[in-house]
Regions:
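Cell-envelope/glycan interface and biosynthesis
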Residues: 25-34, 38-251
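Compositionally biased, proline/threonine/alanine/serine-rich low-complexity intrinsically disordered stretches
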Residues: 19-21, 273-297
Length: 297
């Protein structure tokens, strides 16, 4: 982590003598560090030159300073890797992902376990129900997601928007799942489903790269030549992203049913513009003696 130390000298007269003073400016934090603090205000309160500070007073390194291969980065992701390793691009313009570009899949396990729960029992204790659209028009079902970071509120907002768009119903009603304490298949890394902050929508109308290559997905040559596929309307993607969720359909190793709450990878929500209630005064007409420059041109 690089930071800059700025010093300036101010000279003035006091009792006829020149005085000097030096002011030390705080280290400039990495943009990713600030975005983490901005995205998770319930848990993070500040930073040092290379640490984020949690509200419980503990700190966590941002950049471990190590040069890693891609596999090493996946297995020992630090926060700097999480924020800068692969950039997630929001929006409904989706180009075919480049080889091995899976933005959002570098996850600092220590960070998420501290936030959402370090054990299955702890993560499960933070689950709450939300109302989600069901198969029959006008009906609903209950699904369980974490209350940490207000994920339940954000996902409820998604559900409300989806319910108001019946043409999207078949894609979202028969969900693939939310909370499931498990590792990602073939790895020792925990799935974001372990924390109740991810949802898989209807798998019938979605694609997953391993399902499309069931017989031969472990062959390197197949993985190097994946053909991106997607049946999920981008209207659904736009709704999820607006509420802080990223989409697995933007990965080279596509998982188009998958959404997870990752607000740190998305632009911060725009604050509503508050219109002034101050009554505007009527401008006075320029007097006959006013300068010509004060009138209309």
């Amino acid at each position: 982590m690089k930071f800059f130390l700025s010093i300036f000298l101010a000279c003035g007269a006091l009792g006829g003598h020149a005085q000097s003073s030096a002011t030390i400016v705080k280290p400039v934090p990495a943009p990713g560090m600030l975005r983490l603090i901005q995205a998770y205000p319930q848990h993070l309160k500040g930073y040092t030159s290379n640490h984020i500070i949690w509200k419980d007073g503990t700190s966590m390194p941002y950049d471990d300073g190590l040069f890693k291969t891609e596999d090493e980065t996946f297995d020992s992701t630090d926060l700097e890797d999480q924020m800068n390793g692969l950039v997630y691009t929001p929006g409904t313009r989706v180009d075919t992902p480049t080889f091995n570009c899976d933005p959002g899949t570098f996850r600092c396990q220590e960070f998420f376990r501290k936030m959402y729960g370090s054990s299955e029992a702890q993560a499960k204790s933070r689950l709450v129900p939300i109302v989600w659209p069901a198969k029959a028009r006008g009906t609903t079902q209950r699904i369980w997601v974490t209350s940490v970071n207000g994920v339940n509120r954000h996902l409820q907002a998604v559900a409300n928007e989806l319910a108001a768009r019946p043409h999207l119903r078949k894609h979202v009603t028969d969900i693939g799942g939310t909370f499931n304490w498990r590792n990602i298949m073939g790895t020792t890394r925990q799935s974001p489903h372990s924390f109740g902050m991810a949802i898989d929508i209807n798998t019938t109308y979605a694609e997953y790269w391993k399902w499309d290559h069931r017989a031969d997905w472990m062959i390197d040559s197949v993985e190097q030549n994946l053909r991106w596929r997607n049946s999920v309307p981008l209207e659904i993607v736009e709704i999820f992203e607006r509420h802080g969720f990223i989409w697995g359909g933007k990965w080279y190793h596509y998982d188009t049913m998958h959404f997870e709450y990752r607000p740190e990878l998305l632009p911060p929500p725009k604050k509503p513009v508050v219109k002034s209630t101050t009554r505007k005064s009527t401008p006075k007409k320029p007097s006959a003696t006013a300068s010509p420059r004060g009138g209309k041109r």
